[in-house]
C-alpha cells in the first residue's frame, strides 16, 4: 500500500534535519493565479489527516482565505503606525523634521510649526532629529490582524485599511502575532 505524502515519517524524510513545525509557503507575484486556493487546499488536506494547521493569509490588500474556508475573522487587533504630533510651545521652527522627511509628508509655513500634509509612513526620522523635543508620538490605524481558531485550524489574517500604502506594517504585525502564538504554544 502506498503511503500518503502527509504521513509523519514521509514528511520527516523530506527534511535533512529534524524540525518541530514544518512550514509550507505559497508565494508568487501576479494576483488571481490561485495562491490562496492552493494554500487553503493544502491546509484542508493536512486537517483531514488529523494535523494541526496554522494558515497565514498575508495578502493584506485582499485577504480571502477566510472566505474560501467559510469561517469568520475573529479576535481583531489594530495595527498602528507612529504619527508626529507637534508641540507648539517646544518647537523652535528649525525645519529639521521637514528636511529629514523622505516622503515630504511635512510642510512648514513661514513662522509656524510643521504640518502633516500627507500620509506619514511611520519611519520616525522626525523624532530623531528634533533638537527641542517638540514632537510627540501619535498613532494612525493602518490595518488589523485576526486570529481565528476552528478545531485544529488556526487562521492568521492581516487586513490593510483601503487607501493605506504601508502594507509592510500589517504583514510584520501579523508575523509577530503568529510567532508569539507559536512560541507560547510550543
What are these regions (language model features)?
Residues 1-17:
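C-terminal lobe/tail of nucleotide-utilizing enzymes
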Residues 58-60, 131, 157-167, 171-186:
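Switch II (G3) loop of P-loop NTPases
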Residues 21, 34-38, 60, 92, ...:
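Conserved active-site and cofactor/substrate-binding residues in soluble primary-metabolism enzymes
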Residues 51-66, 138-144:
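Short beta-strand-centered segment that lines the nucleotide-binding/catalytic pocket of NTP-utilizing
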Residues 14-49, 53:
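Walker A (P-loop) phosphate-binding motif
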Residues 70-89, 155:
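N-terminal glycine-rich dinucleotide-binding loop that anchors FAD/FMN and/or NAD(P) in oxidoreductases
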Residues 139-151, 155-169:
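FAD-binding core/adjacent interface of flavoenzyme oxidoreductases
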Residues 86-104, 114-134:
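Cysteine-centered iron-sulfur cluster-binding motifs in ferredoxin-type domains/subunits
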